[in-house]
């Protein structure tokens, strides 16, 4: 009797599997899906991702086209690798592709994703985005932080001056990370924390976050294999960084609550005042505030630092471009000027071209933050289902020879001097900050710091790397994670100009 029951169960399971396979084939025959590489049962195409997914995805796109459908486990993932497809997706279907996938690793780190970058599209996201723009990121606010930028850059320049007088090597990567974190913490948290013991660990934890979020954990896509992530320590690391940041942000909040005689209110004060009031039916909780602050801190620190690091790397690797930039800046400055102001930078066309070229070759987020379709769409004649995750490979788009010419892989700032193509979301061949509703709202905040920092570093000093390594493997080696900086610190020798 038991054997009969077991046989019936097995037969039922087999019949269901065959029925499912038949239905899948029938569905596939009725819809027009984008080109797809063959996928392995259970894992799909996850095995085709390298440590640098933007590179492996571009290689796949060369074979399967600029619009291809992958499967990470059973999750359909649309990969966009051309400006033409990106335009149709983010211009025509912007609202339908404004959502974010709900990733478990994000929920563990960011309090269920109740911050701005990873929050689902909806009223809560609209309200917190508005709060961030009005109180931190709009043009008037960014201009009001000019004195903070000047003070922190001047302090950094003193350290460079000391290294140049001693002829000692300088870890420029560490210096730039300190600069960006100090500026961001002063304008968002009210003071800087870089001199506290906990900050060294804080910087390590920041790097861990980008690696975790950009790492495509197996358990996100194949729940039955979530144990692999546990063995790799993914869950433990996520809980560790969440606690570390939560503890620091609790300290920041308590400092603000204890302060009774503050002459001006900062971003944290504004958020704390919102805790007691609803905005259009949206209630911001104490835990939300912690991770919203963290959101702003990470966005203002990591990506800006990575951009400055890549700029200095490319300029040192291309001395002819460095000289051209120095000539432009020094023509504006005199020996009596120790600080190049933001007003001075406004007229420096070659400097802006250098920044744009580095943004093109080294976008801080090579793969834009993943999106998710909220409705079925038709894209380039293909049927794309709701719930499909969307990856936009900005790195591949910005190195496309069809758009940028045969020298697309080369560092050539001159290509931007007479070009109207900009990075603010309307030119889809150049989208380092994204486009549409989900475009990064902190572009002005980042550019204000990047341009004036670069002008001062290049004006007062000449630069050379610690060792001239052969080839690009060392000079341009990339870190792993959502945002990509140098794999190795940029060790340099500055000398007075």
UniProtKB/Swiss-Prot annotation:
Gene3D superfamilies: Cytochrome P450. Heme binds at residue 440. PROSITE patterns: CYTOCHROME_P450. It is a single-pass membrane protein. It is an enzyme of class 1 (oxidoreductase). Pfam families: p450 (PF00067). The gene is CYP71A14. Keywords: Heme, Iron, Membrane, Metal-binding, Monooxygenase, Oxidoreductase, Transmembrane, Transmembrane helix. The lineage of its organism: Eukaryota, Viridiplantae, Streptophyta, Embryophyta, Tracheophyta. GO terms for cellular component: membrane. GO terms for molecular function: heme binding; iron ion binding; monooxygenase activity; oxidoreductase activity, acting on paired donors, with incorporation or reduction of molecular oxygen. CDD domains: CYP71-like. The keyword Transmembrane helix applies. Its cofactor is heme. It is found in: Membrane. This is Cytochrome P450 71A14. PANTHER family: CYTOCHROME P450 71A2-LIKE, CYTOCHROME P450 FAMILY 71 PROTEIN. The chain crosses the membrane at residues 3-23. Belongs to the cytochrome P450 family. InterPro entries: Cyt_P450 (IPR001128), Cyt_P450_CS (IPR017972), Cyt_P450_E_grp-I (IPR002401), Cyt_P450_sf (IPR036396). It comes from the Eukaryota. It comes from Arabidopsis thaliana (Mouse-ear cress). Its EC number is 1.14.-.-.
């Amino acid at each position: 009797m038991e054997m009969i029951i077991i046989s019936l169960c097995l037969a039922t399971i087999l019949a269901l599997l065959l029925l499912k396979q038949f239905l899948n084939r029938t569905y596939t025959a009725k819809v027009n899906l984008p080109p797809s590489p063959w996928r392995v049962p259970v894992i799909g195409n996850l095995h085709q991702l390298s440590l640098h997914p933007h590179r492996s995805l571009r290689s796949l796109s060369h074979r399967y086209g600029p619009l291809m459908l992958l499967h990470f486990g059973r999750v359909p993932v649309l990969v966009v690798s051309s400006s033409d497809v990106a335009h149709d997706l983010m211009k025509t279907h912007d609202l339908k592709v404004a959502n974010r996938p709900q990733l478990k690793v994000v929920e563990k780190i960011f309090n269920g994703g109740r911050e701005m970058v990873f929050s689902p599209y909806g009223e809560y996201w609209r309200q917190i985005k508005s709060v961030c723009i009005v109180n931190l990121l709009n043009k008037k606010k960014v201009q009001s932080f000019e004195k903070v930028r000047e003070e922190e850059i001047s302090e950094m320049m003193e350290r460079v001056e000391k290294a140049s007088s001693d002829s000692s090597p300088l870890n420029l990567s560490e210096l730039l990370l300190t600069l960006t974190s100090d500026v961001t913490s002063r304008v968002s948290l009210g003071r800087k924390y870089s001199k506290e013991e906990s900050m060294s660990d804080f910087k390590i934890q920041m790097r861990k976050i980008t690696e975790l979020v950009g790492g495509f954990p197996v358990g996100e896509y194949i729940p039955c294999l979530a144990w692999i992530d546990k063995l790799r320590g993914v869950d433990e690391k996520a809980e560790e960084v969440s606690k570390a940041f939560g503890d620091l942000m609790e300290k920041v909040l308590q400092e603000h609550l204890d302060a009774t005689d503050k002459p001006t209110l900062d971003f944290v004060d504004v958020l704390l005042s919102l805790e007691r009031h609803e905005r259009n039916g949206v209630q911001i909780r104490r835990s939300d505030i912690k991770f919203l602050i963290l959101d702003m801190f990470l966005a203002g620190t990591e990506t800006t630092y990575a951009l400055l690091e890549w700029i200095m790397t490319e300029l040192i690797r291309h001395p002819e471009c460095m000289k051209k930039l120095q000539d432009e800046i020094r023509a504006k400055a005199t020996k009596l000027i120790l600080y190049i102001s933001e007003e001075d930078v406004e007229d420096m066309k070659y400097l802006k071209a250098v920044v744009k070229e580095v943004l093109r070759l080294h976008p801080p987020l090579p793969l834009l933050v993943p999106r998710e379709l909220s409705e079925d769409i038709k894209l380039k004649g293909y049927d794309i289902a709701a719930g499909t995750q969307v990856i936009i490979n900005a790195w591949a788009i910005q190195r496309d020879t069809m758009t940028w010419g045969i020298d697309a892989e080369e560092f050539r700032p001159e290509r931007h001097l007479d070009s109207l193509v900009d990075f603010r979301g309307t030119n889809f061949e150049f989208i380092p900050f994204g486009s549409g509703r989900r475009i990064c709202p902190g572009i002005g905040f980042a550019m204000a710091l990047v341009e004036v920092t670069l002008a001062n570093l290049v004006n007062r000093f000449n630069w050379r790397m610690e060792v001239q390594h052969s080839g690009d493997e060392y000079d341009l080696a990339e870190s792993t994670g959502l945002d990509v900086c140098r794999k190795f610190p940029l060790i340099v020798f500055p000398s007075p100009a």
